[in-house]
Every structure is written in C-alpha cells, then in structure tokens.
Amino acid sequence: MQPELAQFVIDRIAVNALDAGADVGGPGCNPNVIILATSDGPGMARRLVREFRLGFRPAVGDTNLSRAALGDFQNSGKPVRWWNVAIPVEVSSGEIAARMYGDLLYPDGGPIPVVVRVRDGSRLRSNVRYDMAWTVIIIDMNRTGGAPLGVLADYVSMVSLAQIDPNADLSDQQTVMNLFEGDATVRGLSSWDRDYLAALYSAPTDRNNPGSQEAAVARSLVTLRRMQDDPQGRQAEPPEASRRP
C-alpha cells in the first residue's frame, strides 16, 4: 500500500477510535494495532505465526482464541483477518496479572505476576480486567473486491477497536462487518457500529464474569440510545391529574 493511502487508513482509524472514546497515542507512540497489507494473506499470516508465535499466544490463560482459531487465522481465504490479544491486568495498578509464556524461558520462571489486591467483597466487581494488548490485522489486497478505501478503513477500525468473532453471522444487523458478505448497502461504520463502540468504551471494565461484562455494555448502549432520543435529558412530564398547581 502506498504511504499516502496507508496514512489515510491510519488517520481514519484514529478518528473512529476517538469518536468511540478510546485513547489514541500521537506520533512516536508504541503501537498496539499492527496492520499489514499484502497480496498473500495466508502466506503472511503463517509466516508471522511461525516467527512470532508468542505474540499470538503470549500468556497462560484466556488471553486469546483457541489453537483451532489460530489455524483459521493462518489458512482462511478472507479478505481481512485479525487476531486480538487481551491481557489480564490488576484494576488499580494496570500491572499484568498473568504468567506469560515468555517468562518460562527464564531459568527462574521469570518475574512473578502481580499479586492481585482485593479491593472489596463485591460480587459484581472483579479486581482484574482484560485490556486489549495488541491486534494484528492482515489485509489481502487481492481479495478486497475493490472496496472503497474509506469503507475498508472503517472495517479495519471495527476489528481494531472491538473483539469481533470472525465467524459471527451479523447478516441481520446494519454493520460494516457485512462488507464482504455481499451487502451492497455498506457505506462505512453504521450508527449501530458507532453506538456499539461508544458503549463498549464507556461501560465499566471490572465486571466479575463475561456475562456481567456483556450486560454492562448492553446497559451502556441503552443509555446512549436514550440520550440520543432525548439529548437534553428531559424527564417525561407527569400526567395532568398529578401535576401540582
């Protein structure tokens, strides 16, 4: 991809990230989203996994998808493939709270993971949250079907900012994720996409299980939609009979 086109994609992703409420670093920052454009998606994926395997499965625990999913990442024929890595961190300090596979290369087992401090006895909140550590995205330019670059950049934004199941059926949603599913109406991030990302980044991140975390995002989405319907936050007026003079 030509440098000016690559910069366009980077800028588009940054704008979408800011709109969602994500933090965006400036020039010279340590990037955690790596985007590669190639004419051979499977070949590039296999080479990356072979040479940087710990980057795809870095920790002992649920930081990424299964080995089978990693095989799909390497061998699928999709125009865009991605791999997200989420790392458990201690809520109050941000320190990594898991044993990393790379640590096992040290004779003494490497640094000891941070001891998680118990803040309170709440059953709703966890002392550990999962942060998106990095994402690898490969665009197979021979398979994108001439998708407009802006729409492609929005698609890449979505998989950069959220953990999207590559095999999810979203055909009943108005979403940029249907770009390569034969949906000619896709013109970029939809209102559904933007609202979902905004809810994802505004919801609390310390719920104590995946179901509770999903519910927190859903509540955030409902609140966002209500604010859009009533931007001034007006309360519904009481019935006539109950009004005071």
Where are these regions (language model features)?
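Short, solvent-exposed mixed-charge patches
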Residues: 242-245
